[in-house]
Amino acid sequence: MAIHRTVLMCLGLPLFLLPGARAQEQAPPGCSPDLNPLYYNLCDRSEAWGIILEAVAGAGVVTTFVLTIILVASLPFVQDTKKRSLLGTQVFFLLGTLGLFCLVFACVVKPSFSTCASRRFLFGVLFAICFSCLVAHVLALHFLVRKNHGPRGWVIFLVALLLSLVEVIINTEWLIITLVRGAGTEGDALGNGSAGWVAVSPCAIANADFVMALIYVMLLLLCAFSGAWSALCGRFKRWRKHGVFILLTTTASIAVWVVWIVMYTYGNRQHNSPTWDDPTLAIALATNAWAFVLFYVIPEVSQVTRSSPEQSYQGDLYPTRGVGYETILKEQKGQSMFVENKAFSMDEPASAKRPVSPYSGYNGQLLTSMYQPTEMTLMHKAPSDGAYDVILPRATANSQVTGSANSTLRAEDIYAAQGRQEATLPKEGKNSQVFRNPYVWD
């Protein structure tokens, strides 16, 4: 008997090991034999849809992460305060888009308790976050396009957060009701009338029920779509392009939702292909998330650092007073245009000062006019003085000697000009007015 038992054990041992060996042999091409069968869709080369969606979702995760960093890093460079108030909502939108790309992996992986629960809860919540941000942005655009000033940034973010929390409450209640159901069998067996609770698999749900749980998300999508149309009407046209971005995004989202709902509830069943339910959800997530990135996120990031026309106009009239070397040179150059030569403006009255250079009328012609004494010279001139009168010359329009390249009147030029005039003019009596060098005594 002992020998027979030993023989049976030796023959039965391979039978226990045979299912494991068969499972290892049935691993699809491209997957490791030690890999959990739950993740075969991620590496199965015979069904390439999982690998393609995995690559698309991975690229989306990287792109969304980079755009989030760019948007946050551009905060100090945003000149328009109205655009700065929308940055919080747009970052919240990017986080929702990043979650959609990550949820694609849960739809590619084969159904289990954790994957089905995450699909049912996060599918509606993540889309609700994105569409709530679009609704809040549309609400802000209604004020901006008509009054050129909108609500504060925390108000816009609070609106998006409250709208998305509604879907969180709906999905939480739905999961509690469907996953934990009361069954009176155990309570009746105990005889105390208490109800027992039996856990139900989250995957055991009809496709139509899954779609019906997303009615609130569809309502948010329709609100964003209709609000984008009304945001295109207003006096301030520079805000209309943001409404166009939202309109394109919601239009693409509506098209994606119509297609995947029809395929998920009707098309797959008609073609007897229930195995395409998971690819349908994964394709819908990846397509709509990329629509968010291409039609809304990238255009908004490109517009966030651009200044408003009002700021550009004010910058032309009142340039920013910086501390750079070029700014100092410009200011000195602008001020030097109106600085007088103090040697020739000592006798100017204070009321006659104007921000115009006294040499601005010089035309470069030969000195032909006679120099006239100023008021101060006539007041201090004694009647008996004749040949030794000191006359302070004034700079006039024709106060330059031929060949001089400088517009400033110099004493040497005055002396040379007066010397030529004294040689040509006839000498008169002592009382005659003689124009002499004001700096040299005879």
UniProtKB/Swiss-Prot annotation:
Ranges facing Cytoplasmic side: 72-85, 142-155, 231-242, 302-442
Record keyword Glycoprotein present: yes
Superkingdom to which the source organism belongs: Eukaryota
Membrane topology category: Multi-pass membrane protein
Localization terms from the record: Cell membrane
Residues with glycosylation annotation: N192
Coiled-coil positions: none
Molecular function via GO: G protein-coupled receptor activity; protein kinase activator activity
Cellular component terms per the entry's GO annotation: extracellular exosome; intracellular membrane-bounded organelle; plasma membrane; receptor complex
A Pfam family per the record: 7tm_3
Transmembrane segments: 51-71, 86-106, 121-141, 156-176, 210-230, 243-263, 281-301
Positions carrying Phosphotyrosine: Y415
Keyword Lipid metabolism belongs to the record: no
Keyword annotations from UniProtKB, A to Z: Cell membrane, G-protein coupled receptor, Glycoprotein, Membrane, Phosphoprotein, Receptor, Signal, Transducer, Transmembrane, Transmembrane helix
Primary localisation category: membrane
Annotated positions of the Phosphothreonine modification: T424
Modified residues (Phosphoserine): S345, S384, S404, S407
Signal peptide extent: 1-23
Topology feature Extracellular, residues: 24-50, 107-120, 177-209, 264-280
PANTHER family the UniProt entry points to: G PROTEIN COUPLED RECEPTOR, CLASS C, GROUP 5 (PTHR14511), G-PROTEIN COUPLED RECEPTOR FAMILY C GROUP 5 MEMBER C (PTHR14511:SF15)
Task performed by this protein: This retinoic acid-inducible G-protein coupled receptor provide evidence for a possible interaction between retinoid and G-protein signaling pathways.
Family: Belongs to the G-protein coupled receptor 3 family.
Protein name from the UniProt record: G-protein coupled receptor family C group 5 member C
Gene symbol of the encoding locus: GPRC5C
